[in-house]
From Swiss-Prot:
Belongs to the herpesviridae UL92 family. It comes from the Viruses. This is Protein U63. It comes from Human herpesvirus 6B (strain Z29) (HHV-6 variant B).
Amino acid sequence: MEMALPRKYDRVTGRILTHKNNQMCTTECSQMYNLHNPITFELGLGNVFVCMRCLTVHHCDMQTDCTIVNTHEGYVCAKTGLFYSGWMPTYADCFLEPICEPNIETVNVVVVLLSYVYSFLMENKERYAAIIDSIIKDGKFIKNVEDAVFYTFNAVFTNSTFNKIPLTTISRLFVQLIIGGHAKGTIYDSNVIRVSRRKREDSLLKKMRLEYGNALIL
């Protein structure tokens, strides 16, 4: 999954602002930084990378956006240096090291949340095939879905709220939000809905649905 990474979000206008110094790569991204922080650790996402030049995010999962090279030892993604033994990713000895870590602030959180939702849908693609077809194109979320998730997170999860709720819970709430918001019919999945059975989480999900719906029509 690849995604262009916005720098700031205007909560008044509901629009994503791009950093003036960002430059788009004219060819394939080559300076990929392996994103390691408490968020990716908690969610078990060790294969999220950010381009140091254009800030595009690459979820290295051996899917469409990976540039796979077949070697005698296994498969390697040329973009990131991740080594795949069979279908299970493990880390190669060497990575493309960044010059410096990008200053991404809270956008880091949303990038990981989107990667978590994407991974969940791909792992259950038979059940959620219709949703995937409607919101994921060429291995990434369509732009209005990405924008709506950024808008929703910034509108609902203030610093005080965010610090009181585990990232795993927030991630599952976004999974439920995306599935409920784009399913053409009722899809019952006990693993998805159980996260909102408590009063606090149910209240948050209601706010998220309101903001997400507003964002989609902006």
